[in-house]
Swiss-Prot record:
This protein undergoes a protein self splicing that involves a post-translational excision of the intervening region (intein) followed by peptide ligation. Residues 93-256 form the Helicase ATP-binding domain. It is found in: Cytoplasm. The lineage of its organism: Archaea, Methanobacteriati, Methanobacteriota, Thermococci, Thermococcales. This is Reverse gyrase.
């Protein structure tokens, strides 16, 4: 049990544990023991029986009855139809059983008509009357047959009456008589019959169930709405009350958008009136028998006020069912011949089922011509026009295979056809377009509005403002006018006819004004010039007249939509082929399609996998046919599920629903549910309203029950629903008096319990629940609460999360549904409890001491308040005088005069004392994180943090990397810097798997630009890892093992370090092969005579024309680079000598480079000098070195000076140079050599730069093996290698001299003797002497220590084992536990484990003993700022070795990410390349890849375009955007776009101005040399005039003032500090500042928005710090944030943390 909820038991509405809820059981009061069962229904039944037996059955009976009755009805349905229910049909039944009316918007084949017919029979068998209304006579006949078939199959005796035009006269009379006498249980008629016969035949009748099939036909007579309401049982009086509510709500919307002073008063008055009327309607419904109504439609266009009567009286709104989903492959073809021939080819390749659309500019004449051409070629094709009314019918019955018609929005071929089983593809003979003469003859309203939008960017500022007003006015006026009425208005303008309707006359006036405006601006030559240059609009001149062509996007969407329809198995796939007849209009079409559909892509037709696409198209058509014939398989039925998606905010619910079309709406209590089809789901979307539960205040310790469980305390939070007073705004949890606000006494209180009841209501109806609360810990906790309280009502609940509210993101999230993350929930539980405990205790103390109930405190608030107070103190103490000078060149400088500057006189001239000018490259800033956005919004927009978060939320609803010098280990033994490994795409890495060494494949290489903080993790062995805060490391903490992000690693942790992995290098070289590897090919190779004459000479004669070939032939030599270039691969065995063509260069043989050679390399690495061709070694005794060199290079003369020994050979000198012997990097190939060669090299290094000695400490003589060098990079590589072969060591740097030491650990001395000692020559005796002294007093102790004492303490041993271990092994294990470090020798632990009993702890310890890693303690963690490249891999094992440590790859992430996904980069690419040019685009992923992404726009739409698209209705948002919304969007948009742009180059200037009385330093830029990202944002530097050293400038104006040197903080500054100091979280930054201001501890200055502490704030802070310093300190607060992160990562036990917090608080409370 993790928590207790009050009033959440599904049976008694009492308190219940989360455990019981998740088990789908009632509380312990209702049922002692939980009940288990295999299926959901079995569980519901078993619980009901158990409750009944116990006598506690209450509300559970309703759950049972709903499930049981649904099953009974489904059994009856199976008997009556032979089919089982679709998931959606099961949902509809449950709604009916609950007595709810609703609208069904479902695709073809979902069984709407069958369902209506079946439910009418079911109602009839219950003695109830039903009425089915269908659109046409054929459908009346079809429905009657359907009902008769159901009656026959079910053996049901039901009276059926119907009326249609095909009845004979006598039948009509008899049927009419039956209807008048109510001699029926079921009545079926057309909608038209209802309209004509209601008054005479049906008036005063009552139906229990009305099913309307096809809303469009029903609403042609809008009075049918009133008629249906009367038939359901409503009266004139009640319908009038509903009309009054509609009127009042319209009035409310006017006040909501207004700014009148008495606005709130008027709104409250309207609310009271509406609520009174609603209560009267509900009272009527309860007292009277009101029927149920279902309106069903695949599509619909319900408009106007009358349809709203259903909302007010029946609680639902009719949606259009119009789907915004497309499954179309959009392709284009650029014509290379006559378009007719292209169309013929396409029809031949694609087959039957094609629609051919001809653009309006080509005309109907061309369509006829094309139809005739194709008919002559043998295609069965029909032209769809007003003359050929049978064309569609012929296509449907198979007489025609293709249809051709005009590409116009209201054309029959574009809108009037819905045949998903027949239509497969669409071909466009040109781009669908609008074509206007600039004189605008016979304009239409929508085309005029479209044209106005397109040209708005080209108008003057004044004209643009007028255009925006006209556009907004006309769009607002026509919003609810049906299309046929708009046609009358358009005709009236064209013909000059009058209009009787006064409102329509007003619309006509605005339309006329708009047309005249367009005609005027289109005669402006400047506007025409700009239009001609635009890449998205076509301007053409024909017969002396100008025409504008713009894309007709609506027609393209509608026309291609014919090929892709929603049906009961998803969305059929379609294909569109567009022949491009106008490049500009085509570009415009693609751009506008991308604005509407982010996932839209237009692909060249020739690149399509046509066979695969056609296979998928035909597969879908077969499914549709099966569905239509009722033969669909159960498998497909299972694909279409009814689902409930729960989001937090109503805006988000509305936005998501609108992504998929126009949803139907249902009101459940105060909540609105949106229903829409998304192909494989009938989705109901509901908003929870955010947090619904909080800790109670009147139980346990501030809402937490504390129980003793053995040695531990258990903490159980008690939750109740949140309440909010609508009158005073007070939010609370506990009732003092039920239903009454404890603050103001109002009964107008909203309880979140109502939300829970509404959600439970819908949860019972669906097959699955998808909880889509926000993707953070708070959202996870809300999801957990929702999961818990809904679990008893449904069998399937999943969590989904999306990080941007876009259609693709939502569909992806649904596919990737998961369970609730318990670790994230645990972290949020702890965060809330800690906040409550600290807050309540400190707040009560403050209220007592200061005698004020408006005081509060929190752990995070307090240090933040302290920062503001401290800055205010600095501010008040730092006042000095300043002198502001304006110079003759316009430059303004400020001189600080100090505290005594009052009487200083300004100078007449100033002198430019220093000037530094240089070209600099400026990289853009990364995209916004939450804190950076809040800071900039505060600084530049003067917005408060809470306001910014609210604006951002409205907008949102509508690096795992290391530094370049990090060493990575490759699978072949090589060690190199990660930068080189990434750049060279080194694919095989060394990693660990199950703590054993394993080869890993690099799947992806990352190079990321970074400008931000890095964590520097310093290890006890001298290594350090510099990484982004979210980079993961394998860490051991208190015996627990796990991945920890760098920001959460702390001092005292142990990091996994590769150890004893063995060396995998196998490489051996000859001198020649090594030279080739190192790229040394400017060397002459002498070959033996036979090989040269046979293989080489013929090629020399053929390929070399210069005289040098004779030299080559005579001497039998050839440059090495030619041998390589010519591909001769068998020459090495025939090499006689190698030499360089320079004076004094002697030939040397090619020889094998064995251990002796690499030992010499080690000598040179340590103490060598490379001077041209000379190799010199400074080492004593020189004789020893000389003998080594003579041994290795017998063909060279070795010479000796007073302090050096060496030889001269340019080849070997160059080899040593390229290997990195004296400078540069040590070549990675060194560590790919055989182990004995590397060990010989290290021995050589020790023999020069090493020393072996004895250091006496308090324990006696101590052995010291040290290698000393200034080359820390080389020692780091050697250190990593030595660890891998089992030799522990540590690095140390003398900060004074910069010299590094590599010190061999005495715990690896024997391993050093085994591996390195055999190759020592010069210092062997020194080693022997020190070793013998050391071993004389110290016994050998080999191996590493494991920090596992906490785990070891949990092992179980049989009695007496301790003594047995001591006797048999000499190990006293119990002493290990006494060590503060808790470290245990690996070799001894291995022996002791043999005596332990089997347990998980034993297995864990065994895995550590056998592991290829050791554990190195973290000495400290620091942070540093870094600008530059970072690198990473994605690997098959999800880890790699960085600086020896085990590093995670590409998974860790947080909401404060700068990462940009590929989708985000594509958004930037599209905008930048189209608007600015391809040269400005430079993609950057920035931070790490993970769950979250940086704050960015979801579409390539800038602020101006966004305003236009919203104005045009193309983008529909759930709320109106304000000026501040647009300002914030613009800031986010520009920051993101610039983050993906090329660097800018500036002329940077830094100068010192001497004014005599003081100096001023200036820094800025003189000019932008290359603009780059500065096209969109200004550089973050001041613009300066160009200055020259010594220049004297006259002062033209001087001003003196006194002001503080230190600036007060803004809200943005505080948020940046919180981020920097790790106080708070992105989601709480704004709330913390808001709380401080709300409590009156801090105020904000009006103009500059600076934060000032109040007297109250200062007093409260000083009191808290004086009494509770450690409790509210910055350090403790930061530590707790890290603990929360560890809980979230599953490393820390949340109950243990709560115990520690409780103890901490109790110490202060009791004190």
């Amino acid at each position: 049990m993790k928590a207790v909820y009050r009033e959440m038991c599904p049976n008694c509405w009492g308190r219940i544990s989360d455990e019981r809820l998740v088990m789908r059981n009632p509380c312990e009061e209702c049922l002692d023991e939980p009940v288990h069962a295999d299926s959901y229904f079995q569980l519901v039944s078993a619980v009901r029986n158990a409750l009944k037996l116990r006598g506690t059955l209450k509300e559970w009976e309703k759950i049972y009855q709903l499930e049981n009755q649904t099953r009974e009805i489904e059994e009856f349905f199976k008997k009556a139809t032979g089919f089982t229910f679709w998931s959606a049909q099961r949902t509809w039944v449950k709604r009916l059983l609950k007595g709810r009316s609703f609208s069904i918007i479902a695709p073809t084949g979902m069984g709407k008509s069958t369902f209506g017919a079946f439910m009418a029979v079911w109602h009839a068998l219950k003695g109830k009357k039903s009425y089915i209304v269908v659109p046409t006579t054929p459908l009346v006949i079809q429905t009657v047959r359907k009902i008769e078939g159901i009656m026959e199959n079910a053996n049901a005796d039901v009276r059926l009456a119907y009326y249609h035009g095909n009845l004979r006269k006598k039948e009509k009379e008899e049927m009419l008589e039956r209807i008048k006498n109510e001699d029926y249980d079921i009545l079926v008629t057309s909608a038209q019959w209802l309209a004509r016969n209601y008054e005479e035949v049906l008036k005063g009748r009552h139906f229990d169930f009305i099913f309307v099939d096809d809303v469009d036909a029903f609403l042609k007579a809008s009075k049918n709405i009133d008629r249906s309401l009367y038939l359901l049982g409503f009266t004139d009086e009640i319908i009038q009350k509903a009309w009054e509510i509609i009127r009042l709500k319209k009035q409310m919307s006017r006040y909501l958008n207004g700014n009148s002073e008495d606005r709130n008063e008027k709104l409250n008055g309207l609310n009271r009136e509406i609520e009174k009327l609603q209560r009267e309607i509900e009272k009527f419904k309860r007292k009277n028998k009101i029927g149920i109504m279902i309106i069903a439609s695949a599509t619909g266009s319900a408009r106007g006020d009358r349809i709203k009567l259903y909302r007010e009286l029946l609680g639902f709104e009719v949606g259009s069912g119009r789907s915004a989903l497309r499954n179309v492959v959009d392709s284009y073809l650029k014509p290379t011949k006559d378009i007719k021939e292209h169309v013929e080819e396409l029809l031949t390749r694609l087959g039957k089922g094609g629609l051919i659309f001809v653009p309006v500019d080509q005309g109907l004449g061309y369509a006829e011509e094309l139809a005739n051409y194709l008919s002559e070629k043998g295609f069965k094709i029909e032209l769809v026009s007003s003359k050929n009314k049978k064309a569609l019918e012929k296509f449907e019955n198979g007489e025609a295979d293709y249809l051709i018609g005009s590409a116009t929005y209201y054309g029959s071929l574009v809108r009037g056809i819905d045949l998903p089983h027949l239509i497969r593809y669409a071909v466009f003979t040109g781009v669908p377009k609008f074509r206007f003469s600039i004189d605008l003859e016979r304009p239409t309203i929508y085309r005029a509005l479209g044209l106005l939008s397109e040209i708005m960017d080209f108008l003057s500022e004044e004209d643009r403002r007028q255009a925006e007003k006209l556009h907004a006015r006309l769009r607002r006026l026509i919003r609810n006018i049906p299309q046929f009425e708009l046609l009358k208005i358009e005709e009236a303008l064209a013909e000059g006819l009058p209009i009787e309707n006064e409102f329509h006359n007003h619309v006509l006036g605005v339309f006329r004004e708009l047309v005249e405006f367009l005609r005027r601006v289109l005669r402006d030559e400047e506007v025409l010039r700009k239009l001609a240059e635009d890449p998205f609009i076509s301007l053409v001149k024909e017969e002396g007249k100008w025409y504008i062509e713009i894309p007709d996007v609506r027609t393209y969407i509608q026309a291609t939509g014919r090929t892709s329809r929603l049906f009961a198995g998803g969305i059929t796939k379609g294909l569109s082929v567009l022949i491009v007849d106008n490049e500009k209009v085509f570009n415009g079409l693609v751009r506008q399609m991308r604005w509407r559909f982010q996932e839209f892509k237009m692909v060249p037709f020739e690149e399509l996998d046509l066979d695969e696409i056609l296979r998928q198209i035909d597969e879908d058509r077969e499914k549709v046919r099966l569905v239509m014939e009722g033969k669909i398989s159960a498998k497909v039925k299972d694909l279409v599920r009814s689902a409930l998606m729960i989001v937090e905010s109503p805006n988000k619910a509305r936005t998501i629903a609108n992504f998929f079309g126009q949803p139907s709406k249902t009101r459940i209590g105060d909540l609105v549910a949106y229903e829409i089809s998304v192909g494989d789901r009938m989705l109901t979307i509901l908003a929870s309203g955010g947090h619904m539960f909080d800790l109670v205040t009147n139980e346990g310790y501030h809402g937490v029950l504390i129980q003793n469980e053995g040695d531990m305390l258990k903490f159980i939070p008690v939750y109740d629903t949140l309440k909010r007073c609508r009158d005073c705004g007070h939010q609370f949890v506990d009732w003092e008096k039920k239903g009454v606000c404890p603050r103001c006494g109002s009964t107008n209180v909203r309880d979140a319990l109502e939300n829970v009841i509404a959600m439970r209501e819908i949860a019972q109806e669906v097959d699955e629940i998808l909880i889509a609360t926000d993707p953070d810990t708070e959202g996870e906790k809300i999801a957990w609460d929702i999961r818990n309280v809904l679990a008893p009502y449904t069998p399937n609940i999943k969590r989904i999360e999306f990080h941007e509210v876009t259609r693709p993101a939502i569909m992806k999230a649904i596919q990737e549904a998961r369970d609730v993350n318990e670790n994230r929930v645990n972290a949020q539980i702890v965060r809330r409890i800690e906040d409550r405990w600290i807050g309540f205790e400190l707040s009560q103390e403050l209220q007592r001491v200061f005698e004020s109930y408006n005081l509060s405190a929190g752990r995070v608030q307090t240090p933040v308040l302290g920062w503001i107070i401290e800055r205010y103190k600095e501010f008040t103490e730092s006042e000095v005088y300043f002198l502001g000078l304006t110079l003759e060149n316009g430059l303004q400088v400020t001189i600080e005069l100090g505290k005594d500057g009052k009487d200083v006189e300004p100078p007449e001239y100033v002198t430019v004392e220093e000037v530094q000018l240089e070209e600099r490259e400026l990289n853009p800033a990364p995209p916004y994180t939450t804190d950076a956005m809040l800071k900039d919004a505060s600084t530049f927009l003067k917005l408060s943090a809470p306001e910014t978060m609210r604006l951002a939320q409205d907008l949102f609803e509508a690096g795992l990397c290391v530094t370049p010098d990090t060493l990575v280990s490759l699978a072949d033994g090589r060690i190199m810097e990660i930068k080189d490994a990434v750049e060279k795409s080194e694919g095989n890495l060394l990693s660990v798997n199950g703590l054993k060494p394993k080869e890993a494949k690099a799947l992806k290489f990352w190079e990321i630009d970074w400008n931000g903080p890095l964590k520097v993790i310093k290890l006890k062995n001298g290594h350090e890892i510099k990484a982004t805060p979210d980079h993961g490391l394998l860490v051991m903490r208190e015996g627990k093992l796990g991945w920890v992000s760098a920001k959460n690693v702390r001092e005292g942790d142990y990091v996994a370090f590769a150890y004893n992995t063995g060396h995998r290098g196998r490489d051996e070289y000859t001198l020649l092969k090594l030279m080739i590897k190192l790229g040394i090919t400017d060397v002459m190779v002498e070959l033996d005579e036979e090989y040269f004459n046979e293989k080489v000479a013929p090629i020399v004669r053929e390929r070399i024309s210069t005289s040098t070939k004779y030299k080559y032939l005579r001497r039998r030599v050839l440059p090495l680079y030619l041998l390589q270039e010519w591909g001769l691969d068998d020459y090495e065995a025939h090499v006689k000598s190698l030499y360089r063509q320079r004076a004094g260069s002697k030939p040397i043989p090619n020889f094998k480079l064995d251990g002796r050679f690499w030992y010499v390399f080690g000598l040179v690495l340590g103490d060598g000098t490379l001077r041209d061709s000379k190799v010199l070694i400074s080492q004593t005794p020189l004789k020893d070195v000389k003998s080594v060199l003579e041994d290795v290079f017998p063909f060279l003369r070795v010479f000796e000076t007073t302090n050096q020994v060496g030889f001269s050979n340019s080849i070997i000198a160059e080899v040593f140079r390229r290997l990195g012997a004296r400078k540069g990097k040590l070549h990675p190939l060194v560590f790919g050599l055989r182990e004995e060669y590397i060990n010989a090299m290290i021995a050589g290094y020790f023999d020069t730069d090493g020393t072996f000695s004895i250091l006496n400490d308090r324990k006696g003589p101590n052995f010291r093996g040290i290698l000393t060098s200034k080359r820390g990079d080389v020692l780091r590589m050697l250190s990593v290698y030595l660890y891998q072969i089992g030799i522990m060591n540590y690095l140390r740097r003398d900060e004074r001299t910069g010299v590094w030491d590599l010190i061999i650990s005495n715990r690896s001395l024997e391993k050093f003797r085994e591996k390195i000692y055999p190759y020592l020559r010069i210092r062997r005796a020194q080693f022997d002497e020190a070793y013998s002294v050391y071993r004389a007093s110290r016994r050998a102790f080999e191996g590493d220590l494991l920090p596992v004492a906490p785990v070891f303490g949990k092992l179980k041993f049989k009695n007496g084992t301790k003594n047995r271990i001591l006797k048999e092994t000499g190990i006293d294990v119990w002493n290990w536990l006494k060590r503060p470090e808790g470290e245990i020798p690996r070799d001894k632990l291995s022996k002791v484990l043999e005596y332990a009993e089997e347990s998980p702890e034993k297995e864990f310890l065994k895995s550590l003993v056998e592991a290829g890693v050791t554990w190195v303690k973290v000495k400290g963690v620091e942070e540093e700022l870094y600008t530059g490249k970072l690198y990473d891999f994605t690997t098959t094992t999800e880890n790699f070795l960085s600086n020896g440590a085990v590093s995670h790859n590409c998974t860790y992430h947080r909401t404060d990410s700068t990462h940009v996904s590929n989708t985000g980069i594509e958004v930037a690419k599209e905008y930048i390349t189209q608007e600015l040019g391809e040269k400005y685009f430079k993609p950057r992923p920035w931070g790490e890849e993970g769950a979250h992404e940086a704050i960015r726009p979801t579409r390539p739409i800038d602020t101006g375009r966004l305003m236009q698209l919203i104005r045009d209705g193309i983008i529909q948002l759930p709320r109106n955007l304000t000026r501040n919304h647009y300002r914030l969007y613009d800031m986010i948009f520009r920051r993101f776009m610039t983050s993906q742009m090329t660097p800018a180059k500036i002329l940077y200037e830094k100068a010192v101005i001497n004014a005599g009385v003081g100096k001023a330093e200036l820094e800025g830029y003189v000019e932008i040399i290359e603009d780059g990202w500065t096209r969109l944002r200004s550089p973050p530097l001041r613009e300066l005039p160009k200055l020259e050293k010594g220049m004297k400038l006259k002062v033209v104006e001087a001003k003196k003032w006194k002001a503080p040197k230190v600036s007060l903080y803004t809200q943005g500054d505080i948020i940046a500090l919180m981020k920097e100091r790790k106080i708070g979280r992105p989601s709480t930054y704004a709330k913390i500042v808001e709380t401080l201001m709300r409590r009156g501890y801090v105020v904000e200055t009006k103009g500059r928005k600076k934060l000032l502490p109040t007297e109250k704030g200062i007093k409260v802070y000083h009191y808290l710090v004086s009494k509770y310093r450690d409790l509210v300190s910055e350090e403790r607060t930061r530590e707790l944030e890290e603990i929360m992160d560890r809980i979230e990562e599953g490393i820390e036990d949340y109950i243990k943390v709560l115990g520690e917090l409780y103890s901490e608080i109790q110490r202060y409370v009791s004190g």
